[in-house]
């Protein structure tokens, strides 16, 4: 019975671990799309915001919050370079 209980416990730990990974991926996607919304409005500047958003999403997925700041700053810079009507929305 003890061996069976141990195997059951190991199975539960794996299940929890998979749930946490899925959770991280979901947060990564959400952070990515939020950062992309901060991109510039036209020209090459929108690419700056998009790249910043993707980098931000990947870093948040690994547990580093700084990635979101990088994506947001790139989006704001792209918005400022494009004109006053652009920026984070």
Swiss-Prot record:
GO biological process, one term: sorocarp development
A matching Pfam family: Coiled
Matches recorded under PANTHER family: HSSA/B-LIKE PROTEIN 17-RELATED, HSSA_B-LIKE PROTEIN 17-RELATED
Family as reported in the entry's similarity comment: Belongs to the hssA/B family.
Name of the molecule in the record: HssA/B-like protein 14
Gene name of the encoded protein: hssl14
């Amino acid at each position: 019975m003890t061996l069976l209980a141990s195997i059951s416990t190991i199975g539960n730990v794996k299940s929890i671990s998979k749930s946490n990974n899925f959770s991280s991926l979901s947060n990564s996607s959400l952070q990515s799309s939020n950062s992309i919304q901060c991109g510039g409005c036209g020209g090459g500047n929108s690419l700056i915001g998009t790249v910043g958003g993707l980098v931000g999403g990947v870093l948040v997925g690994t547990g580093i919050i700084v990635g979101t700041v990088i994506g947001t700053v790139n989006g704001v810079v792209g918005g400022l370079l494009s004109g006053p009507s652009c920026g984070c929305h």
